[in-house]
From Swiss-Prot:
Amino acid composition bias (Polar residues), ranges on this chain: 36-46
CDD domains the record matches: MFS_SLC17A6_7_8_VGluT
Protein name: Probable vesicular glutamate transporter eat-4
Biological source species: Caenorhabditis elegans
Keywords assigned by UniProt, alphabetized: Cell membrane, Glycoprotein, Ion transport, Membrane, Neurotransmitter transport, Sodium, Sodium transport, Symport, Synapse, Transmembrane, Transmembrane helix, Transport
Glycosylation sites: N100, N114
InterPro entries the record matches: MFS, MFS_dom, MFS_Na/Anion_cotransporter, MFS_trans_sf
Extracellular topological domain: 91-121, 172-174, 235-239, 326-344, 403-406, 459-471
A cellular component term, taken from the record's GO annotations: synaptic vesicle membrane
Length: 576
């Protein structure tokens, strides 16, 4: 732990000076008043001070006026957009790596590399080996540590690694490229589970679909922007341009994310009391204790039919999503005879339609639930099975039509219909087990990632010798979705599972530890230790509630990471 703290302190010192210049420029541009001195002279923390300045400047813009839970959703949307845009870079760049090509200006370019399409497919899919490995561990980490920091770490480091990828290509080292891809997958594998961990504290039950789908729509918006932008940059600038652009954007986003997001409403220094009370009252008692490896009901999770319904649905959706993300431009080039520069924008339309459907579906799903028109279980099943059923049907049309126009229209309709399913399986974890939502997301997304691993090889096997192999590719995608529809319709549930809450003795044991020592047993700060229920026979003198110290500077306290022994008095205290 000491080595981690030393590394963290060194990191603060390294970023302190450039962050100071950035915040000074922002303050000058907005006319913000200089903040109060955050710490005593001689004990200054550069990163804390300048992050507080950034937060104060942001509070004078639209960010300060935005409800904090929706600010989280919007920034998360941008983060997912960058993350999934990064995944489009390789697919666009590889089309110029293994054969000669003519750019839009008529100039013929000789390919720079001697790799075959098979070798490039292996390097591209290596991302998913890393992505798969961190799924279940990421779910546990997101339940154990502040999930907002974990999410920012995944996007920021993944973006930085994207900047390094062109170097691996230029030195013509397939091992280095594969290593960077695997490492990218490792760090970005934490993002989905971490975001589910964030919504555990920030999403009121009747807003779960809206908030979660707003955030996750970034995944599909990432493809909407990433496919045409990557194709444009590869065609008009260079094959390395998309890697650099997305890498820089991701690093900038990560800095903003760390400055303005917090683990819980109680930790946020500038959230309105109205919003804070609304969220906490709606969610109810959220345990301050966090699961340990021994306390997680692994057997119940693995044997739960509703959990497996989510997993099967996740795999089905992942199969088609990665199929299109990795091969849509290739399909349009080989099967439909389109140029890469021309097909980029057209390839984005299905994902654009899906993004719109996801947002509308989230609003409609929560409307049906909040007005008690349908039960949560009914909403999840109808949206998931309707979306997947429509996608499977249109995929059959794509597989067997001989008209290019019909194929494109059916592909747009298929991907668009799948948007309804996001209000089904993709938020279902929060319904059945909010305490373990991050872990369930890691579990289901990990198995779903197998689709990303196997899809490139299956597609290559079908299409290696003839463009007619694309019929088999889309037929298989349709059958996988019909399987997902059937399984989810039979076994899915929207009700809280009996194993989803901790046992009373585990809950009380951790609460008593917090009360007596003032230190959260999870290893990071938590101040709002309000105990509303006590086990029978326990003296009421154990009931306690930590209160903020009077006069606490909310900006300074929000970044205070050096807790002292004894009761934590700072309501915004958070420690990694």
């Amino acid at each position: 732990m000491s080595s981690w703290n030393e590394a963290w302190d060194r990191g603060k010192q390294m970023v302190g000076e450039p962050l100071a210049k950035m915040t000074a420029a922002a303050a000058s541009a907005t006319g913000a008043a200089p903040p109060q001195q955050m710490q005593e002279e001689g004990n200054e923390n550069p990163m804390q001070m300048h992050s507080n300045k950034v937060l104060q400047v942001m509070e004078q813009t639209w960010i300060g006026k935005c409800r904090k839970r929706w600010l989280l959703a919007i920034l998360a949307n941008m983060g997912f957009m960058i993350s999934f845009g990064i995944r489009c870079n390789f697919g666009a760049a590889k089309t110029h790596m293994y054969k000669n090509y003519t750019d839009p200006y008529g100039k013929v370019h000789m390919h720079e590399f001697n790799w075959t399409i098979d070798e490039l497919s292996v390097m591209e899919s290596s991302y998913f080996y890393g992505y798969l490995v961190t799924q279940i561990p990421a779910g546990f980490l997101a339940a154990k540590f502040p999930p907002n920091k974990l999410f920012g770490f995944g996007i920021g480091v993944g973006a930085f690694l994207n900047i390094l990828l062109p170097y691996g290509f230029k030195v013509k080292s397939d091992y280095l490229v594969a290593f960077i891809q695997i490492t990218q997958g490792l760090v970005q594998g934490v993002c989905y589970p971490a975001m589910h961990g964030v919504w555990r504290y920030w999403a009121p039950p009747m807003e779960r679909s809206k908030l979660a789908t707003t955030a996750f729509t970034g995944s599909y918006a990432g493809a909407v922007l990433g496919l045409p932008l990557s194709a444009f940059l590869v065609s008009y600038v260079s094959w390395a341009a998309p890697f650099y652009l997305y890498g820089v954007c991701g690093v900038i986003w990560a800095i903003l994310w760390f400055c303005v997001t917090f683990e819980k409403p109680a930790f946020h220094p500038t959230i309105s009391q109205e919003e804070k009370i609304f969220i906490e009252d709606a969610i109810g008692h959220v345990s301050n204790t966090h699961p340990t490896i021994r306390s997680i009901p692994w057997k119940a999770i693995v044997t739960s039919k509703p959990v497996w319904a989510i997993i099967v649905a996740n795999f089905a959706r992942s199969w088609t999503f990665y199929l299109l993300l990795q091969n849509q431009l290739t399909y349009m080039k080989e099967a439909l005879g389109m140029k890469i520069a021309d097909s980029g924008l057209l390839a984005a339309i299905p994902h654009l339609v899906m993004g719109c459907v996801v947002l509308m579906g989230g609003q409609l799903a929560d409307y049906l639930r909040s007005n008690k028109i349908l039960s949560t279980t009914a909403v999840r099943k109808i949206f998931n099975c309707g979306g997947f059923g429509g996608e499977a049907a249109f995929m059959l049309i794509v597989a067997y039509t001989t008209s290019d126009t019909t194929a494109i229209m059916a592909l747009i309709a298929a991907v668009g219909m799948s948007g309804f399913a996001i209000s089904g399986f993709n938020v279902n974890h929060l319904d059945i087990a909010p305490r373990y939502a991050a872990i369930l997301m890691g579990f289901s997304n990990g198995i779903g990632t197998l689709a990303g691993l196997t899809c490139p090889f299956v597609t290559e096997a079908f299409t290696a010798h003839s463009k007619h192999g694309w019929t088999s590719v889309f037929l298989l995608a349709s059958l996988i979705h019909f399987t997902g529809v059937t399984f989810y319709a039979v076994y899915a549930s929207g009700e809280l599972q009996e194993w989803a809450e901790p046992k009373e003795e585990e809950e009380w044991s951790n609460k008593e530890l917090v009360n007596k020592t003032g230190i959260n047993g999870t290893g990071y700060g938590a101040a709002e230790t309000t105990f509303t229920q006590l086990p029978a026979g326990v003296d009421s003198s154990y009931q306690a509630q930590a209160a903020p110290a009077p006069g606490t500077n909310p900006f300074a306290s929000a970044w205070d990471e050096h807790g002292s022994s004894g009761v934590v008095e700072n309501p915004h205290y958070q420690q990694w």
